[in-house]
Each structure stands twice: as structure tokens, then as C-alpha cells.
Amino acid sequence: MKPDRDTLDEYFEYDAEEFLVSLALLITEGRTPECSVKGRTESFHCPPAQSCYPVTTKHECSDKLAQCRQARRTRSEVTLLWKNNLPIMVEMMLLPDCCYSDDGPTTEGIDLNDPAIKQDALLLERWILEPVPRQNGDRFIEEKTLLLAVRSFVFFSQLSAWLSVSHGAIPRNILYRISAADVDLQWNFSQTPIEHVFPVPNVSHNVALKVSVQSLPRQSNYPVLTCSIHTNIGLYEKRIQQHKLKTHQHHNPNEAEQCGTNSSQRLCSKQTWTMAPESVLHAKSGPSPEYTAAVKNIKLYPGTGSKSDHGTSQANILGFSGIGDIKSQETSVRTLKSFSMVDSSISNRQSFWQSAGETNPLIGSLIQERQEIIARIAQHLIHCDPSTSHVSGRPFNTQESSSLHSKLFRVSQENENVGKGKEAFSMTFGSPEFSSPEDTNEGKIRLKPETPRSETCISNDFYSHMPVGETNPLIGSLLQERQDVIARIAQHLEHIDPTASHIPRQSFNMHDSSSVASKVFRSSYEDKNLLKKNKDESSVSISHTKCSLLGDISDGKNLVPNKCFTSFKNNSKEKCSLKHQTRNQCQNNPSEIIQSTYQETQNKSSSLSTSSILSQHKENNLDLTSRFKEQEMSNGIDKQYSNCTTIDKQICTNKYKEKIINENYNPKFFGNLQSDDSKKNDSKIKVTVLEMSEYLNKYESMSSNKDSKRPKTCEQNTQLNSIENYLNKDNEGFKCKKSDQLKNEQDKQEDPTNEKSQNYSQRRSIKDCLSTCEQPKNTEVLRTTLKHSNVWRKHNFHSLDGTSTRAFHPQTGLPLLSSPVPQRKTQSGCFDLDSSLLHLKSFSSRSPRPCLNIEDDPDIHEKPFLSSSAPPITSLSLLGNFEESVLNYRFDPLGIVDGFTAEVGASGAFCPTHLTLPVEVSFYSVSDDNAPSPYMGVITLESLGKRGYRVPPSGTIQVTLFNPNKTVVKMFVVIYDLRDMPANHQTFLRQRTFSVPVKQEVKRSVNKENIRHTEERLLRYLIHLRFQSSKSGKIYLHRDVRLLFSRKSMEVDSGAAYELKSYTESPTNPQFSPRC
């Protein structure tokens, strides 16, 4: 026979050994880094926060997962120490990122006895779990309480704060060490630690567990972690600076005198590569496993040079592939090699944050000192990089943007601000795009600065004039795999780099460049933010136009997402070859040109520049241009257009065909287009846009007749030779065939004034245009307005019990007024109550009231129909009123809503475990006017056992009610004192919450019955608690907890002069009754 639990002093929810393992796993895996807003998570091995929650999917450990292997190792170590009655010590520390892996809290592959690790590691926490003799006394805590306290400490720890502010980016190398709590085995803190001792629970009948933790004081900045291997990099940096100065003086001593001798004193934001903070990058897109593993495991390989996998071309874009000896600097050319850390100058770092508005200074402060080491390594890597670049005549000054991520060395932008009022755009290159020889051999670019040497001497510290040297192929194969890893990381970072540079670029000329793959021109935030600052157009002449670059002559407000930007000068020679070029374009890639008719319809001020530039492209650049334009749209227009049918493409193409046939040889039109493009005058642009819109309106009728014929393709028609010249980004006049046919005849007869007004009305979003394009012909677009919930009241809804109601939803039967039941938005735009949550039961076939057809009686609509639903006044005896009838199930519910839950807890002499239990919520139809009643909820406690939920003899009971959306509906707090309750007795408490006028004072008399005589107060919430005492005098909540709650929240009522007041009542004569 099972002994009565009351005969025992206490019971234990956990086995002592299992509880200890749960604590250790919570400490070691309770803040596992992850790429999210929270930055960390609890692993599957941690004990659940709420033991009452059902375990949906139980985790099964696998030997293939490193975390599972580590958890198994932790379990075995803790168990072994506990069986030997030894105190357990868990130390948490950080390791430098340069020479240690970041696979998480694991010790695999790491020798913890290595003195180098002990020297490099930063100890953050030291936990001691020590068994002590059993604690005796009235005041004790349960194991669950200690588990909650440890979880709270872990949640608010310093490590959790770092992970949270960096969204899981830093720190990455977290190491946990489990050992016996011996003084000789303890590692030392860098500062005096802060100690915290937790309450001591009994884990068995003989043993209690004492848990204490020592932690490092809170740090304002992320600590500097330097490993013993790389502490001598500062020597390299000094030698590099001396060598740079020597080389620079050898080539141009005059410039060296002007620029000074100390490179550290010439940190200029326009001539540095600023390191983007890791956490800023990962805040938007977390690091992939490939990224983190690759970046963190970059080692320093010795060597004297390398043959880059970029190929043997001398005009490669610089990509950092490895580190070499200092001697290799004598035999290699560095055209792009300026590098500086964000934190190398305080003012420089602040200006960087101001220019990159998306960065967070808090994150930068955390990793500021950490990146100092990375900067030195990167500085060394720059001078040891084997890549070469042929510079024609003069050094090319570079501007490196903040998109350079830590340990990823690539050139993102090449620029300099050199002119007096000159402003230029730049090209953006990433090293992974030139990872194949065929790409780089075709993409050789010779750069010729337009500025004299005297203007570029300001940044002579950041480049060197070294002759073109021979690269050493001996370590090329060694660095090949490393370069591939960096290329993949760079490609990943191209899409998630949030930082930007606002510095204008230097103008340069392009020579001998053939068709470069379109992947070179990748989108970057640096150039977009650059355009916001540029108010003028820079002039860059491109010889032979080998590389097709799109221009933007806007005022900086209308942006085109850019792969690379420049603007072009118009010349007569290019005008002459306009027809031939556009004809070739149409013959080669008609489908891409057709797509561009939609892709180029967003930006008005950029449209004329784009059309004139595209007309100057040569035949060998068409493929690049088309690909680039397809990537250009920033608002998903290209994606939307892909949903259009082939017929729609042909329709749009035919409209342009008709326009081009009549306008292709119109020199006046070309003159207007070229004039507006070159002058950059807003008024001229508007005139040209209007003129093009008039042409569209003029020939839409002609195109509509041929659209009905639906020709198969337009690829073979040479009449499309000038499509690119008529792209108008303000057009919406490229409207789809459906809209064109509806307005065809009116467009013919409209005068210019009407055309202008129509042109203005057509300036809607391109998304509307595309959605209209997808509609069938001769189909009207139906607009459905958002319906208010009162619309449902107009339906004559008959409930299942025979009553007609206008107060409940016609489909779900739920109350129409604001309800705790979650809403969902239907396809029609109306908000319905979720019918999936509704289950109807216990319907009465008889109706106590006649059927009211309110809509048929017009007099009722003119008079306010006052609700007579209970409780109007709770002034009579309890028997027979609404409150007692509902609480005692005298009403049949109209329906039951699933999904409500409640958290039940208590506090007093001890704190029992909080429970989360389901709540059965029902509603009724009780009034003559069918007004909805309050909801009733029942929390069943029978699942906890025959006795129920044990609570202290006196204290507070808290019941928090959640709706199916897990939103708090009401929190009930009931203060009670049952210390006088005899054994084997029972009683109840009932707390009512009323809404009463704010200015009216309720006068309390000796007789509590008078409280209920205020006519203006309304019952909003009620909770009914049942208590019973065991034979030993312990108090339990038993059977169930019953709730009444309002249809809508009254705490934040709209301007009502009411307040909520609660009153708790209990039986008085007798106060306690014997148990049955």
C-alpha cells in the first residue's frame, strides 16, 4: 500500500542525481548562441521552464551532433563526481577568436590542460555545486525553485547580455570546464569576482544542495582577447610602416615630405578600410555555419609569396589570399592596400558610425578592442598578398568601405575624393567574383586617375610604388583552398552587409575592358547611400564602352539599386550609331528588352539618362546590360512581372512597336531626349516625359487592334530596333491591355489638357499596374471595402436553440462585441472570429423566449435597445441570479471556445510550482434582447490528484488567464488567510471585480451585504476558489477554479469614467464546514 503523502515531511520531484545533471546542463547549455533577436537559446537538454507543459516532441540524442556528445560527456562527469561525494565546479570562459574554433560550448579537440589555453582564456563564471547535510526547519524551498533561480541568473548574466546585444554574433568561443571543486584546479579571475549563494533545497532525505556562483563584474566594453601566438604582430606592423615609408620616399620624396612620416597620425576616414562590427552584420542575417567555421579558422600560414587563384592577369582586382613573409613585399605590387581599424582613432570611429546610420554604437563598443588584434593581422595580410595590379602611370588611390568584415579581406569600393567640387561614382568589386581565370582575364581594367599627383599626395601613406614583380608559385596550391573559403564568405556577405560609405569617388577612365560577367556588379548598400549624398552628376568618359554601366542623373532622391554607377557624355558619334546598336539589341535579346519595358518604369528622373545610355552600348555588351537591368528593381517589380502571361508581354511589345514605327526616324524626338539627358534640367525632363506619354496615348488605339491578333513572338521583327530609347520610368502608360482597351476611344478624342490630367492620374504604383495587367480582358476590377463587425448584425441569424439574434456572429455564434477570442482576416478583407476554435454542445431544443425578428420591426431601430442581460444589479439573494446560475451550471452554454489557458501559482511560507492548465470557456445567451453574456471559465484541478494544488496556509493566489493567442486577458490576485482552518474542513473564497464610477465613493458598513447595493456598478470579473484541509492540516485548492470575465477589457476603456474595484468574500456563519 502506498503511504499517505501527508505522513511524509516532504516529497521530492526529482532524483538527486538527475536534478544535479539538470542544473549542470542549464548552466552550460542555457545560453547557447543563435542568430536571432534574443541571441541565445536553451538547448534541448536543458530542463523545461514549465514542467506542466506537455512535451510535444522529446529530443533524442544523436552521436552525430556535437552538442549531444558534449551533453553526454557533461552528464557522465557530473554523475561521477556526485557518486564520489565531491563538490562539482563548472567554469565558463572565453577564448580568443584567432586560434580557437567556435563550434560552441564543447571541449572536443581542446586540451584543457594546455597552459596556453589557461593563459589566453578569460574566466567569466565559476559555479560550485556542493552537497551539504539536510536542512531542517519550517522555511524550505523545493528543487524547482532553485532551478528557476539558476535559470534567472543565467538569463541575466553578462554572457547573455553580450549575446543579446550582438544577436548571437559575439562571443563565439565559449568554453565550459567541469572538474572537482579543488583550489588547485581553479583558474583565476582577471578581477575580483562577485559571489552569489542560492537558497539551499533538500534533494533527498539526507542531502541538500548548496549552489554558489562567482562571476566577473559587469564589463562596459567587450574584453580584449589576445592569444599568446599573435602577440608579436605589433612588431610586424611597425616594420610594415617603416618599409612603406622607405618605399614611398624612394619613389617620390617630395610627396613623402608633404604627407608626413608617421602613418598612424594620418588616419583619414576617406582613406581607410573601416571594419564593420560583426554584430551589426549578424543582426540582420546571422552567420551561417559555413561562414563562422571558415572565418574563425583562418590561420596565419608562413610563406614568401603566393600565386593567387585569380589567375595570372596583372589587372586583377585585389583579393587577399594569404600571409607571406616581409620579404615578399619587395617583389609584388600593392595598388590597393590601405587598411585601418574603426577603433584606431576615436574620431574616425565616430564619423564612421554617423555615416553608416544603420550601425549600433553599442555593438561597436563591445568589439572595439577585440578588432585591434584583427586589424594588425589584416594589416600584415595586406602587405603579404600576392595579387598584382597594373597601374598606368600613377598610383590609384583607394577608398575602402565598411563592408570589409573581420577576417574577410576584400576590396569593396575603389574611390577617392580629390576634386574641388568634383564628385564621381565608383565601381564595386568583390574578390569572389574574380575567382576564376576566365573571369579575370576578360575583366582586366586599367585605371588612370584624372587628378594630378599633387592632389593625391594626401593618401600616399596608403599605397606604395612598387614595380611589378614576380609572384612565388610555391605556396599557390597551399592557399588555393583558403581562397575558395574566403570567396564563399565574401559572396555570403555581399547580400547582408549593412554598412555603407558616404564618400564620393574619384573619376577614372575605363580601357580595354571586354564583357565582364554580370555577377561582378553586385548590389551594395555603400553605393546606394552614396547617391543620397551626391547632388551633381559626375562626368566619366568611357572609351569604346566596353563595360556597360548604368547612370543616374537624379538629384539623389530617386535611387536605382546599383551594381555600378556612372554617367555618360553624349557625343555625335554615338548618336550616329544609335539605330544600328538598338537594332542589334533587339535581334539578340528581344525577351530581355521586353522585360525591360516593365523594369524601367519606376523612376522618372532616372529614365531619360538610362534610355540615352542604353542607346550608346555596343553589341558585345548587350548581354551584360540586360542582365544588369533585370537585377535592378528594388521593389520586387521584376518578380511581379514574371507572373504576367506571355500574352501580356506581347501586348506591351506591340504598343511599343506601333510607337517606334512612327517615331524611330524622328530626329526631333531624339534631339529632345539627348538634350534633356545632357542638361539634367527637371523642367525639360517633365516636358519630355509628357511628350512620351502623349505618344503612348496616341498609338495605344493602333496597338489595341493588333493586340487582339496575339502574334506569337516579336523576336524576328527588326521594327523593335529602338525600344530601349523609349523607356519611360514614369510611364504607367505602359498599362496593360485591359486598361488600354477600356480607355482606347477616349484617349483618341482627348485634348492635350485631358491628356495631361490623365498622365497625372496614371502615376500610380507599378504594383497596381501589374496587378491590373494580370486581369482577364473585359473584366472589371472589383474593390471590396473593409467591413465593420456591425455588418454582421444586419443578418437575421437564427441560433441553434431557436432564438433569433443579432448579437452573435452568423457563422460562429460568438459574441460580436470585443471578445478575448482571436480574430483572423478573411480573403474578403473582413475580420471574422476563428471558427476553428468553436465547438457547440449542450444546445437546448426549447427556447425560453419568443423569436425576435428585430430587422422586421423598423421602430426598434429608432429607439436605443437597452440590454437586460444579467447581472443588472447583484442586490438580491445569491440564489436565482445570473451569477449563481452560471457558476452552478444552471444555464446551458451556447458554445465552448477552446484554447484558453491559465497559470496558477501561490506564494506565502513556501512557493509551490506554478501550473499551466487548460481552461474550458463557455458563453451563453440569456437576455431578452440576445445581448452576449460574460464568459465563464473552469480550471479543473482533478488532474493534480485527489487532494488538488497545495498552497501555504496564508498568502496570495495568482491566476493569470490567457486567450488562445497567449495574450493575458485578466490576472486575478487573491489574498487569503486560512491559518484558523481546522483539519478536514473546507471553505471557499469569491472575489468580485466591479466597474464603478470614479467619483462615487462606496460607503462600507459593518454589514457586508450593503456593498452590493450600488446600482451603477457592473460586475466585470469573478473568481471562485475552493479550499480544503487535509488530516494533517495542509491547505489545498481542490476540485476546480471558476472564473467569470468580461467580453472586453475594462482596464483601458475608451474614456469611460469608471474604475475597477475588487471585493473578496468568504462564508461567515459558519466560516468552515466539515468535509463530506
Swiss-Prot record:
Cellular compartment(s): Nucleus
Chain positions covered by the region annotation Transactivation domain 2 (TAD2): 962-970
Region (Disordered): 700-721, 739-765
Region (Required for macropage invasion): 878-935
Ranges where the record places region Transactivation domain 1 (TAD1): 24-32
SMART domains per UniProt: DUF4210
Keyword Nucleus: yes
Keywords: Nucleus
Biased segments, Basic and acidic residues type: 739-754
GO cellular component, one term: nucleus
UniProt similarity note: Belongs to the ATOS family.
Domain notes: The protein contains 2 transactivation domains (TAD). Each of these domains may be required for transcriptional activation of a subset of target genes.
Protein role: Transcription regulator that syncronizes transcriptional and translational programs to promote macrophage invasion of tissues.
Protein name: Atos homolog protein A
Upper lineage: Eukaryota, Metazoa, Chordata, Craniata, Vertebrata
The encoding gene: ATOSA
